[in-house]
Amino acid sequence: MVDPQRMIDTECSLRRLAKASIVHIDHRPVSLLPMLLMLIVLGISAGCSVPDREASYGSTGSEPEQSTAKESATNEPRKSTAKESATNEPEQSTSRKVSQLSLEEAVGQMFVVGVGGTEPDYYIEKMIRERNIGGIILHDYNMQSKEQTQAMVSELQKLSIKTSRCIPLIVAVDQEGGRVSSAPWVTYHPPAAAVGQSGDPAQAQRIAEEIGRQLDAAGVNTDLAPVVDTGFGAAIGDRSFGSDPHLVSKMGAAAVRGFEAAGIISTAKHFPNHGAAKVDSHTSLPVVDHDMQTVLSYDLPPFKRAVEAGVPMVMVGHLLYPAIDPERPASLSPKAIKLLRQEVGFDGVIITDDLAMEGVKQRGTVAQAAVKAVSAGADMLIISSPPQEQADAYAAVVRGVKQGRISQDQINDSVDRILKLKQQYLLRNSCGP
């Protein structure tokens, strides 16, 4: 589709040029207007062309076909830091890009999905080409070496750039240090608890920057870290910097600055605070019975400090906080999202913990959780479950918008935040505005 503004600009140009369209060659008057018309029209067509999609769901608006279990699976350039790249593209360009996306394309940007192996396969290529997904998450079983990871990421990024209007993928890993270290080429670093015991924020910042630079070398642009949970509860343990929110706050903020120095998207997690939970959300839904005063004074301060330090993404956990919302876990709760936006003051990208975890699946299917999370205000959804569940979740969100259960404005707001994040950290100069 031709940009209406460009058509207006073209019409104005033609009016100006028509007056000066007669020149003399060999002393004979020649009209250049037909030639000018042809060149300008060709210029518009070239400028607005987009690579064809193969039976794109975005072009048809139909619900994606369901893949079956029988279907067989078949060096990004160094990016500038956030401060360097923030001025590469006018701020209003993200809104323009959002307006150019179909509903199906926009919804796809909200999904960060798991990959099945160590190289691109039919399913992940289908998710990129036909659902326009916003990112992938890589686990230890996806990454054998830096070179293999780099090759896989490069191939998937090229596919995304080709098929989604030059929008790159979020490529996320869990690389916290200690026992949560999924990238085998990254130098081992001690767990957060050991770093916290040092009491030295400079150490936290240095470690985060080293991790970030080593991830970046393989094309990984997002770390689902740091953990800014306070306390050593179930599933967290030594992943936390400590049980003192003041200590966790300064260590977490330092880690955010370290990732920022490396040009990596960091993620403060798990809001409101998994460190106080007695149950692991991978296996069940934790209930944290803190009153609101404790939430405000103990659970939230590290997240506030991370936001003040410039963290671009916050992960909401599968945690039931009755003082916040007695019915829904934070990842599916409008009240929890509102608390994060208004009380903590975060205006960046909110991403859910993996919707394939039992802590949320006990309350329904992955597709149902996806609709609830988007309705609650989450911007991005992590889904590491099998391809069929990923496709079902995507289709459910698209259907939810079409049926009026999710507002189009909410989708647009989320995708605008996602594209601003990508513009700041990921977009290459070759992509243009």
Show the residue positions of the predicted features:
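Active-site-proximal loop/short-helix segments
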Residues: 182-187, 221-239, 243, 269-285, ...
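Glycine-rich, aromatic-flanked loop segments that form ligand/cofactor-binding clefts
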Residues: 157-187, 207-227, 248-272
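Preference for extracellular/luminal or secreted protein segments
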Residues: 4, 47-66, 71-79, 83-131, ...
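Hydrophobic faces of well-ordered beta-strands that scaffold small-molecule active sites
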Residues: 109-115, 134-137, 169-173, 223-224, ...
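Bacterial N-terminal signal peptides that target proteins for export
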Residues: 14, 18-35
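Second-shell residues forming the walls of enzyme active-site clefts
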Residues: 102, 144-161, 165, 247-405, ...
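Sec-dependent N-terminal signal peptides of Gram-positive bacterial secreted proteins and lipoproteins
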Residues: 29-52
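Glycine-rich anion/phosphate-binding loops
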Residues: 198-210, 246-249, 295-296
